[in-house]
Amino acid sequence: MSEFRSALMFGRHNAPAAICVCGNTSFFKHPMASKFWVQDCCAATENILLAAVGLGLGTVWLGVHPIHNFSKRVAKILELPDHVKPLNVIYVGYPAEEKPARTQYNPDRVHWETY
């Protein structure tokens, strides 16, 4: 965890555990399909975040991709092969405090049929 804390710009949180969500580009049969690893990993990340909340855990999503420096550091820490790309690191732990629910929903950002 100390390696992540020093490698990531926003990684200074004091969580006891982390999950690194990675895309394995060697799984794709078609060359164009390998471009969608980011979407696949984002869907997996959201599922991890929701499951953690359901278990009473707190999480924070730390972006890694597309910042080459961050990707390189995380790949080195985890000794990832070249075909495995880190998308993010999720810190997981029990929250120190319970914060009130909030939303970032803004109806002005929702467009129907046309922009």
Task: List each language-model region with its residue ranges.
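Acidic, surface-exposed loops and disordered segments
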Residues: M1-Y115
